[in-house]
Amino acid sequence: VELFLRSGGKLRDHLKPDIDPYTRRVEVDGDLTLREILRVLGIPEGLVAFAFADGKLRRLDYRPGDGDVVTLQPPVSGG
């Protein structure tokens, strides 16, 4: 399965984009959840609050399909 993960901010540093400043192309074997993909990439699950794919809000148990573009959103912080 080939997919594209997008993010900004501190999460982008962990994502290590390679397509453009915000996007990383990822190939995974099998039917993995987003949580499992993050684990394979070494991205701490706590850095992702939620994700968007196909115009819908997705949880980390979402299973991306071939060609999906998934935008990862970090937790909101500030003061």
What are the functions of these language-model segments?
Residues 1-78:
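Ubiquitin-like/PB1-type beta-grasp interaction modules and other compact soluble beta-rich domains
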